[in-house]
Amino acid sequence: MLEVLTVSIFNQERKVRIYLPEDYYSSHKRYPVLYMHDGQNAFGAEEAIGGVSLDLHKHLDQFKSDLIVAAIDQNTEGEERINEYCPWKHGDFSELLLGYKSGSGGKGSDYADFIVNELKPLIDRKYRTMSGENYMAGISLGGLLSVYAGCKYPDVFKRIAGMSSAFYRNQEEIEKLAGSTP
């Protein structure tokens, strides 16, 4: 079952696609929450970049997963996805790989703060969530941001999944942060 919320982040309206387990409205259970990035790619091909989605809801339904998913749509303006998903502007490694010094990035910390301080409380108020069972997952730059958020908020996110993470954008910084996080 899918619902859509609209939130405001960085002075822009953004969709958050919510997946609820099939039995959500017929039970009184509480559920863990998985926060994801690039929400337009999570559930359906209609709005997915390139017309291909993860079809996550089909897999969750098939395996009867007791999980709420909150998938935040990306900012599609210019390089804003890079700006929002990269905690730091750039690193030496990204310059080496890209062949130029990128000025993109640097809003990832604010984006992670938004999820923890605004979106998570909204989800906790609106849905029957399970206290202390919050996860985050992302692909590419979303993987970088997920690892960053897990390091910044280890008491909030119990599990992190970074798939094909684009660490190269902030390689040195994320290694240093991950190495200093208990």
Regions inferred by a protein language model and the residue ranges of each:
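Non-catalytic cap/lid and distal C-terminal segments of serine-dependent acyl enzymes
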Residues: M1-P182
